Amino acid sequence: MSTITSYFGFLLAASTITPALLIGLSKIRLI
């Protein structure tokens, strides 16, 4: 049960961090 919870937590973190990184990279490229 703990492994499933940590797995979904990892997916949630990845789904929130990845777009933020992409936006940051796009802003850096625009500058």
From Swiss-Prot:
Which keywords are on file for this protein? Chloroplast, Electron transport, Membrane, Photosynthesis, Plastid, Thylakoid, Transmembrane, Transmembrane helix, Transport
Transmembrane stretches, start-end: 4-26
User: What is the membrane topology listed in the Swiss-Prot or TrEMBL record?
Assistant: Single-pass membrane protein
Q: Where in the cell is it found?
A: Plastid, Chloroplast thylakoid membrane
This protein's source sits in the domain of life called: Eukaryota
Q: Molecular function (GO) terms listed?
A: electron transporter, transferring electrons within cytochrome b6/f complex of photosystem II activity
A GO CC annotation recorded here is:
cytochrome b6f complex
Record's function text: Component of the cytochrome b6-f complex, which mediates electron transfer between photosystem II (PSII) and photosystem I (PSI), cyclic electron flow around PSI, and state transitions. PetL is important for photoautotrophic growth as well as for electron transfer efficiency and stability of the cytochrome b6-f complex.
UniProt subunit comment: The 4 large subunits of the cytochrome b6-f complex are cytochrome b6, subunit IV (17 kDa polypeptide, PetD), cytochrome f and the Rieske protein, while the 4 small subunits are PetG, PetL, PetM and PetN. The complex functions as a dimer.
Return the protein name: Cytochrome b6-f complex subunit 6
Species for this entry:
Liriodendron tulipifera (Tuliptree)
